């Protein structure tokens, strides 16, 4: 089957969790599945910007991105984080090829506005061409995508990694989209992890401010993927990534399965 795995930046920064995620991704590919990885790196980007004397600001979980922040994102996401993940997957025994959404015109972006507000070089995916991803699969490789894409103006745009993962899953007609995150799953008002969550329930939780911050774009991406034909979407804690190879074989007790309604 075709599986897109989005790995959060926090998981990549922790050495033990990174190894666990990389081993699971490699094992999926070794089992004959077509696997693509999309990654974030928000914490590392925030840390680098802080070292450069820049403060990070967010609107609904999306980073306000001026030109300097965008260039730093290219360095951190397209460089350091991407190559770190590639190295980990290859250490687990599978060839991995790192690139960003702008390479090969794989993804095109347009400027994204939130509540009418211009966030700078923040984009949303408006076009996807998965031919290079499929070419890597044909050669037995694992594509590793950084969440940056080119606009029609020739500028790079910072794209929310959850949104890019959803677009990648839809473009590749993926059977499954899995988010490996630094949280145990989606929590209800009482703080308990919800094993199942419909997109309708997610909208209600967002309206009631039960979910906020980075979980908002993640759940929007889940809904986007399901609406565009992706069969299954699940949010899993990256610390339990070893369950990934059993995804189709057994019922998982961790994380949240998101369904369309």
For the regions a protein language model found, what residue spans apply to each?
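C-terminal catalytic "cap/lid" subdomain
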Residues: 1-261
């Amino acid at each position: 089957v075709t599986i897109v795995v989005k790995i959060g930046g926090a998981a990549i920064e922790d050495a033990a969790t990174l190894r666990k995620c990389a081993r699971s991704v490699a094992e999926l590919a070794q089992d004959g599945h077509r696997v693509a990885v999309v990654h974030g790196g928000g914490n590392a980007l925030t840390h680098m910007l802080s070292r450069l004397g820049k403060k990070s600001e967010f609107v609904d979980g999306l980073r306000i991105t001026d030109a300097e922040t965008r260039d730093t994102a290219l360095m951190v996401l397209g460089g350091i984080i991407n190559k770190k993940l590639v190295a980990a997957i290859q250490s687990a025994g599978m060839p991995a090829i790192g690139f960003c959404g702008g390479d090969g015109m794989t993804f095109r972006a347009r400027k994204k506005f939130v509540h009418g507000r211009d966030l700078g070089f923040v984009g949303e995916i408006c076009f996807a061409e998965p031919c290079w991803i499929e070419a890597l699969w044909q050669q037995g490789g694992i594509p590793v995508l950084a969440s940056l894409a080119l606009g029609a103006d020739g500028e790079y745009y910072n794209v929310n990694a959850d949104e890019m993962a959803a677009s990648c899953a839809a473009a590749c007609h993926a059977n499954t989209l899995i988010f490996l995150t630094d949280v145990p799953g989606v929590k209800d008002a009482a703080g308990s992890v919800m094993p199942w969550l419909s997109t309708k329930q997610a909208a209600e939780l967002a309206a009631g401010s039960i979910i906020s911050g980075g979980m908002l774009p993640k759940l929007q991406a889940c809904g986007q993927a399901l609406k565009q034909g992706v069969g299954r979407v699940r949010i899993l804690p990256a610390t339990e990534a070893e369950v990934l190879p059993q995804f189709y074989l057994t019922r998982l007790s961790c994380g949240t399965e998101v369904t369309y309604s």
